[in-house]
Amino acid sequence: WETTDAAKEQILWGLAHADVVKISDEEVEFLWGITDEKEAAKKLLDEFGIRLAMITMGPKGAYLANQNGAAYAKCPEVKPIDTTGAGDIFGGSAVSRLLKAGKAPEEFSTEELGFIGQFACTAASISTTQSGGIPSIPEEAAVLDRM
């Protein structure tokens, strides 16, 4: 983007057309100056009509929320080597669990949101222990074993 205003405009357009959103705490602060993940999730759900908001907070974990509830997920402690792709791996891992469940995003319970978040946080954390983005994507069994 040529300017930060242009970036914000395009990101906000994308949010207005999304059902499931994975967004980082840094991106939330950039867009709205919000530093509280609960407030950010509420904004996404209520003002943008997002059906499932996933706010990632780096090594601190993630906060997942829909209209049924919300859950925090903690990341396992690791010694990171390369964080390239960790956010993408979180998003892809979360979406894999959503698709496996075969439910609408707003139908997940607080417990299910917690499991999805924990799975995605674990996958992202494992990925940081290796170099590279794609080569560091862990297998499902490795993620489940680490949980």
Regions found by a protein language model. Give the residues of each.
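Conserved beta-alpha-beta core of the PfkB/ribokinase-like small-molecule kinase fold
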Residues: W1-K43, R51, K60
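Conserved phosphate-binding/catalytic region of the ribokinase-like
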Residues: T35-M147
